[in-house]
Amino acid sequence: MMKRILLLLLTAATIFCSCSKQSSKKLNGEYHYRIGGAVTTQTTDGKNTEYEILIEYQFGTMKIISTDSKNKTLYISMSSAMKGTFSNFTATEKDGVITFKDAEIQVSTRLPGETSSGTMSKNTTKICVDGVGKRYGDELLFDLTAKGIITTKYPDPEKGIDVITDLKVISSSIKCEASKND
């Protein structure tokens, strides 16, 4: 009787361990993604002028590789050939939730009021984000939170030059949706 109970416990432990290792491996693969949103910022020059930086919707390829199944560490690579952006960062997965901190992503940005053919629409900006994502079948949905200082440039029509400035992040609303390629 005791041997049967022990065998049953070992079988259950094996099943649970194999399932927990599988979840991060199931995320492995290539996805196509769409990212967009807005970041509210404030100048750091003492005037505290607020700007809303729009993150233009961009589409691209996301690759996820499980690098350490024991610690459920993931390597994520995002690239957009149309916008010329590329980002790499690591994340962790626990109970189906993907989290990452201090990931530096490159996005195409512009200030409101500018046309899509204006200088800012072609500006590639690096933004530091924390993110939380969840898997729904073959879909991944991420909520990203921008933080820190964003260095960006914008055209100054009065001076006729591009101005480079640091902007402090106040708040953000950035979404990323990814669908697994077949």
Show which residues each predicted segment covers.
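Sec-dependent signal peptide recognition
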Residues: 3-9
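Bacterial signal peptide processing site
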Residues: 20-22
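Tryptophan-anchored aromatic micro-motifs
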Residues: 24-52
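Extended low-polarity, hydrophobic cluster-rich segments
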Residues: 31-38, 56-62, 78, 127-133, ...
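Generic short beta-strand segments
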Residues: 32-43, 101-114, 143-155
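Predominantly extracellular/secreted and cell-surface proteins with exposed
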Residues: 55-136
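C-terminal motif of bacterial Sec signal peptides marking the signal peptidase cleavage site
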Residues: 15-18
